[in-house]
Amino acid sequence: MIAFLSGHLVAIEWGERSSLTVEVQGIGYRVKAPARFLKQLPPIGEPVRVFTHLVVRETELVLYGFGSPAERDVFVELIKVSGVGPALGLALLNTFGLPELVQAVVTENVRLLSLTPGVGHKTAQRLALELKTKLAHWRQGLENADRPLAGGPPPAIREEVEMALLALGYSLQEIQAALQALPSQPRPTEEWLRDAITYLSRQP
């Protein structure tokens, strides 16, 4: 298994191909990767390290690359779930990013998971059912995640607030930051929503 590649960035491809090429000792490795990761890469020609997972198919070998071992390991768990192949695994990481994806699975937020292109309600349910316990154990130690998403409202209220804020045009990253910043005292859904909007309106 190829655990990671360290070399120089040669090329980046966007869109459906969504990949990067890394030159290691004169050999170029094409690695499929989430667009979120591609946006974080250094300029062409600069050194880069990519954490990889090799998928063996009947006619080809495909390397998938990520910015951290934790992101790679979550991808490996995602593609073990029935109905979730590498393409959907990348789509999930593109839609949410690592901390938000783990939070959505652990809190069984099926509606949020279903926002991923290609992920229907049943697939989202399977993700939550099969990965909830495993990812819950990882939340505190995920490498390169922002901060643990353990605060904020309880799961049932969080789902309602998140969906309402998404409908208002806020990003998942903005929403998670707002909910984490609010005091964790019990309050109705309407108050969580109001306080989150107030917090977000004050951000630059």
Curated annotation (Swiss-Prot):
The keyword Membrane does not apply. Residues 68-146 are annotated as: Domain II. It is found in: Cytoplasm. Residues 156-204 are annotated as: Domain III. One of its GO terms (cellular component) is Holliday junction resolvase complex. One of its GO terms (molecular function) is ATP binding. Transmembrane segments: none annotated. The keyword Isomerase does not apply. InterPro entries: DNA_helicase_Holl-junc_RuvA_I, NA-bd_OB-fold, RuvA, RuvA_2-like, RuvA_C, RuvA_C_sf. Residues 147-156 are annotated as: Flexible linker. GO terms for biological process: DNA recombination; DNA repair. Residues 1-67 are annotated as: Domain I. Keywords: Cytoplasm, DNA damage, DNA recombination, DNA repair, DNA-binding. Homotetramer. Forms an RuvA(8)-RuvB(12)-Holliday junction (HJ) complex. HJ DNA is sandwiched between 2 RuvA tetramers; dsDNA enters through RuvA and exits via RuvB. An RuvB hexamer assembles on each DNA strand where it exits the tetramer. Each RuvB hexamer is contacted by two RuvA subunits (via domain III) on 2 adjacent RuvB subunits; this complex drives branch migration. In the full resolvosome a probable DNA-RuvA(4)-RuvB(12)-RuvC(2) complex forms which resolves the HJ. NCBIfam families: ruvA. Has three domains with a flexible linker between the domains II and III and assumes an 'L' shape. Domain III is highly mobile and contacts RuvB. The RuvA-RuvB-RuvC complex processes Holliday junction (HJ) DNA during genetic recombination and DNA repair, while the RuvA-RuvB complex plays an important role in the rescue of blocked DNA replication forks via replication fork reversal (RFR). RuvA specifically binds to HJ cruciform DNA, conferring on it an open structure. The RuvB hexamer acts as an ATP-dependent pump, pulling dsDNA into and through the RuvAB complex. HJ branch migration allows RuvC to scan DNA until it finds its consensus sequence, where it cleaves and resolves the cruciform DNA. Belongs to the RuvA family. This is Holliday junction branch migration complex subunit RuvA. It comes from Synechococcus sp. (strain JA-3-3Ab) (Cyanobacteria bacterium Yellowstone A-Prime).
